[in-house]
């Protein structure tokens, strides 16, 4: 659809679409044919809906996020019963298993390619989630929020992070300067993202 909401057109079924950095492709969680798992994996298509193909080695994958160079995709899969994060080259090769980090989902790759945001309830026995950041190799995990937060997204310049808690908030990449964004009349907001 257009930025103003007009000219909506269905391209395919699926969840959590993510634009490629060059704007030519969309990665998404493709629906499965069996409710267990409900998602068959990560697929990629051209922006007009053509060229749909499944990325090998992404079984049960969801929440895809492109690397800034468009060569890799970070995602999570719940096939093992835990939300395990992975990185794969777009042709399905070079799968990196980040299970050593622990559970995580709702990944978002930083514009400089050096960090990945993710959501986890690893530090909460009552299962609410917070936002964390790590390097693409799974090292340097740091918790950024402490009062429940989800759906993080980097700003295009990498200077800010937007997230829900449950309304939209913004903070610096080091978790500084947290502030609520005003959305009068909108109600509860989730899945915030940036636009250029």
Feature names for model-found ranges:
Residues 1-196:
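Sequence signature of WD/YWTD-type beta-propeller architectures
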């Amino acid at each position: 659809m257009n930025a103003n909401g007009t000219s909506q057109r269905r391209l395919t079924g699926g969840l959590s679409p993510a634009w490629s950095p060059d704007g030519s492709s969309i990665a998404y969680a493709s629906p499965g044919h069996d409710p267990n798992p409900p998602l068959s994996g990560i697929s990629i298509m051209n922006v007009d809906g053509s060229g749909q193909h499944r990325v090998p080695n992404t079984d049960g994958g969801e929440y895809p996020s492109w690397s800034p160079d468009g060569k890799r995709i970070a995602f999570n899969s719940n096939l093992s019963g835990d939300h395990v994060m992975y990185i794969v080259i777009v042709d399905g090769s070079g799968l990196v298993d980040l299970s050593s980090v622990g559970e995580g989902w709702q990944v978002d790759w930083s514009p400089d390619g050096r960090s990945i945001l993710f959501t986890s309830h690893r530090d909460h026995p009552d299962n609410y989630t917070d936002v964390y950041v790590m390097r693409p190799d799974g090292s340097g995990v740091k918790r950024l929020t402490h009062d429940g937060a989800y759906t993080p997204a980097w700003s295009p310049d990498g200077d800010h992070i937007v997230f829900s808690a449950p309304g939209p908030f913004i903070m610096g990449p080091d978790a500084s300067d947290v502030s609520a964004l005003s959305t009068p009349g909108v109600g509860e907001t989730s899945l915030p993202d940036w636009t250029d």
